[in-house]
């Protein structure tokens, strides 16, 4: 799956753009955000995606790991902020685990009832080189051959409720 970056002017606009992309493409939408007040602008689009069961992945920059819980500039408790408007929220603390957390984010967003997830990435972690993981047969804890099932989250069959005694309204091509 290739990623194309599209610029936006505010995080809430980016969140709604990712939501729209996910709805029309049948793939999870991805949005990025700065830490602090900018990250709070993602709450509304993530809440909408949660209620509409749209898979979104929010990658949010966090403060440096050494500055966590020290009242750093624009430091927020992002875990608490996103807990009520996402299915899953985590903070990466080691560069060697970035790939695992990205995999888990995709699986969490696309499996079960689809919905938004948030992943916090400390600013200093983004500057570190991450070792390339050897990918033989696993995507996080899921086999690689299963990921297609999670990414294509829209039902392929239409479900129809039939009542022989009633007219079937709203069904395309229905004739009495």
Regions found by a protein language model. Give the residues of each.
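N-terminal alpha/beta PP-like core and its mobile active-site loop of ThDP/TPP-dependent enzymes
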Residues: 1-176
């Amino acid at each position: 799956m290739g990623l194309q970056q599209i610029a936006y002017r505010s995080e809430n606009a980016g969140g709604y753009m990712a939501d729209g992309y996910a709805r029309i493409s049948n793939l999870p939408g991805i949005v990025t955000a700065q830490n602090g007040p900018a990250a709070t602008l993602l709450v509304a689009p993530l809440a909408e995606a949660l209620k509409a069961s749209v898979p979104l992945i929010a990658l949010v920059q966090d403060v440096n790991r050494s500055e966590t819980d020290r009242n750093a500039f624009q430091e927020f408790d992002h875990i608490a902020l996103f807990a009520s408007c996402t299915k899953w929220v985590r903070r990466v603390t080691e560069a060697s685990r970035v790939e695992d957390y990205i995999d888990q984010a995709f699986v969490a967003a696309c499996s079960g009832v689809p919905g938004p997830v948030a992943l916090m990435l400390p600013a200093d972690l983004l500057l570190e080189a991450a070792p390339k993981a050897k990918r033989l047969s696993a995507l996080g804890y899921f086999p690689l051959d299963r990921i297609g099932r999670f990414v294509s989250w829209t039902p392929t069959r239409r479900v129809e409720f039939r009542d022989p005694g009633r007219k079937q309204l709203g069904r395309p091509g229905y004739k009495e």
